[in-house]
From Swiss-Prot:
Negative regulator of class I heat shock genes (grpE-dnaK-dnaJ and groELS operons). Prevents heat-shock induction of these operons. Pfam families: HrcA. It comes from Alkaliphilus metalliredigens (strain QYMF). NCBIfam families: hrcA (TIGR00331). This is Heat-inducible transcription repressor HrcA. Keywords: Repressor, Stress response, Transcription, Transcription regulation. One of its GO terms (molecular function) is DNA binding. PANTHER family: HEAT-INDUCIBLE TRANSCRIPTION REPRESSOR HRCA. The keyword Transcription applies. The keyword Transcription applies. Belongs to the HrcA family. GO terms for biological process: negative regulation of DNA-templated transcription.
Length: 343
């Protein structure tokens, strides 16, 4: 049995109808709503074939059909019509990015927030793992005679700050020299490789500049380890209540509980991320907790360096056309800003 043009048209109509109504689709209603140019009986036979082929399923309580994950996958890959002429707040997005955001985390949060507002789905931003990026600059700024503000900047624009306790008698000139030595040795080094750079010779060089500075080094290591913690930014979590799938309070609680599992969510996003934009649908997700949901994930890069991910998550009955069109437009604007901002 093959998927001919008629079967594809009927499958497309069923999926679009189910996305908009959340109700199982019957042959008679389908023939009334869509110009398929065949009788309800023919539609019914084609629907039976599509079910046998695994593209549709029949709920126990209904005579109608709903799409399977396999059906959604075919729809997204081959039948989906993106809204190429979609108009969203391009100038506002560019203005916000250019004027208000200097750190990658802020950019990811903003992207997640605007996508949640535009699509009415839950969105998740995942910051990159710090160990995968390179050090651009470390700055040490005196706060008082006992403390420094350490600012760590990566090549992808991540900025992390920490307060360091320092030995007494460390003057501004010594701090400046120490910063110069550290940057000279570590600039361009991958974060995960920095511990290996603190050889006995390098540590001795720092101690020569300031006796007791070796006590500061473990604190710097600790800061770098803390930077590698998973950072997720959620927006629109209550948007799930817009969908009838979550009228069941237990299902809604299960979804919200899943969002609290940072490791699970981060692995879901990483497993669904590819070049550009990608959708994972229902059973394609790697965890059973996410088998009833779809994720559309965008990967943000500067040159070839990944700086983060943003995912839109919702029921498999997701409005893929709107979601992927909106995400594509927002990503285009953000990438335009990234190219100018971090090069």
């Amino acid at each position: 049995m093959q998927l001919n043009e008629r079967k594809l048209k009927i499958l497309q109509a069923i999926i679009q109808d189910y996305i908009y109504t959340a109700e199982p689709v019957g042959s008679r209603s389908l023939s009334k709503k869509y110009d398929l140019q065949v009788s309800p009986a023919t539609i019914r036979n084609e629907m039976a074939d599509l079910e046998d082929m695994g593209y549709l399923i029949q709920p126990y309580t209904s005579a109608g059909r709903i799409p399977s994950d396999k059906g959604y996958r075919l729809y997204v890959d081959h039948l989906l019509q993106l809204e190429k002429n979609m108009v969203i707040q391009r100038d506002q997005i560019r203005s916000d990015l250019l004027n208000r955001f200097g750190e990658i985390e802020q950019l990811l949060q903003y992207s997640s927030k605007i996508l949640s507002q535009l699509t009415n789905y839950t969105t998740i931003a995942l910051a990159p793992q710090i160990k995968e990026v390179r050090l651009k600059h470390i700055q040490l700024i005196p706060m008082d005679e006992h403390h420094l503000l350490g600012i760590i900047i990566t090549d992808t624009g991540l900025i992390k700050k920490t307060v360091l306790q320092v030995p007494e008698g460390l003057d501004a000139e010594a701090i400046s020299k120490i910063s110069e030595v550290i940057n000279g040795r570590l600039q361009g080094v991958a974060i995960k490789g920095i511990p290996g750079e603190f050889t006995e010779e390098f540590t001795h060089e720092l101690e020569q500049l300031s006796h007791g500075f070796d006590s500061v080094i473990p604190k710097m290591f600790q800061t770098l380890e803390e930077l590698d913690k998973i950072e997720l930014f959620l927006h629109g979590t209550t948007n799930i209540f817009n969908f009838p799938e979550f009228n069941d309070i237990f299902k809604a609680k299960s979804f919200l509980s899943m969002l609290e599992e940072k490791e699970l969510i981060s692995q879901l996003i990483l497993s669904s991320s590819h070049k550009g934009m990608n959708a994972t649908i229902g059973s394609e997700n790697i965890y059973k907790e996410a088998k009833e949901y779809s994720l559309v994930t965008a990967t943000y890069k500067i040159d070839e360096d990944v700086i983060g991910f943003v995912s839109i998550i919702g029921p498999t009955r997701m409005d893929y056309s709107n979601v992927m069109s909106t995400m594509g437009q927002v990503n285009k604007y953000i990438n335009e800003v990234l190219k100018g901002k971090y090069k």
